[in-house]
Design a protein with these regions (language model features):
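Register position in tetratricopeptide repeats
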Residues: 36-37, 70-71, 104-105, 138-142
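Canonical positions in the second alpha-helix
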Residues: 49-50, 83-84, 117-118
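Structural marker of alpha-solenoid helical repeat scaffolds
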Residues: 53, 87, 120-124
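Canonical tetratricopeptide repeat
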Residues: 63, 97-98, 131-135
C-alpha cells in the first residue's frame, strides 16, 4: 500500500512540475505576442506572471526593461536590466541598454566598463558598441574643455 502511495505521489510531483514549466513558457510567449502588438501593460502583466513561476527567466526581465524604456521609467528599466545581467551576464541587449542609460547619466566609466564586457560577448550587435563609443569620444573632450 505504501509503495502505491509513493508511486502516486511521485507521479503527481512530476506532472505538477511539468505543468509549471509549461505555464512559465506560455506566459513568456503570450507576453512576447502582446509586446509585439504594442499592448505593453498586458505584456508587462504576463512577463511578471512568468517571473513568479520562474524567477530566473532573464528574457522576461529584459522585456520588462524594454517596456519601462518605452514608458520612460528609467529606474524600473535599470532594475530589470540589472536582474537580466545578474541571471545572464552575457546578454547583449541588456548590456547595450545599460550602456545607453549610463551614457545618458554621464557615467562614462560605467559605459567603458560595460563596453569592455560587451566587446567580449557581442555576436549580433557589435556595431552598436562602436556607435556608443563614438558618442562617448565626442562627449568626453567637451567635458574636459569646460
Amino acid at each position: 500500500m505504501t509503495k502505491i502511495f509513493k508511486l502516486i505521489s511521485l507521479l503527481y510531483l512530476i506532472i505538477n512540475s511539468m505543468s509549471i514549466a509549461i505555464a512559465d513558457e506560455n506566459f513568456f510567449n503570450k507576453g512576447l505576442k502582446l509586446f509585439k502588438d504594442k499592448k505593453y501593460e498586458d505584456a508587462r502583466f504576463m512577463f511578471e506572471r512568468g517571473i513568479v513561476f520562474n524567477p530566473k527567466d532573464s528574457n522576461s526581465y529584459l522585456y520588462l526593461a524594454k517596456i519601462y524604456n518605452i514608458q520612460e521609467d528609467q529606474d524600473k528599466e535599470e532594475k530589470n536590466l540589472e536582474a537580466t545581467l545578474l541571471i545572464e551576464p552575457s546578454n547583449e541587449e541588456a548590456i547595450l541598454m545599460s550602456m545607453k542609460i549610463a551614457l545618458e547619466r554621464s557615467n562614462y566609466s560605467k559605459v567603458k566598463d560595460l563596453s569592455n564586457t560587451f566587446s567580449k560577448v557581442c555576436k549580433k550587435l557589435c556595431d552598436e558598441n562602436k556607435e556608443i563609443l563614438d558618442t562617448l569620444s565626442n562627449i568626453e573632450p567637451q567635458k574636459n574643455d569646460s
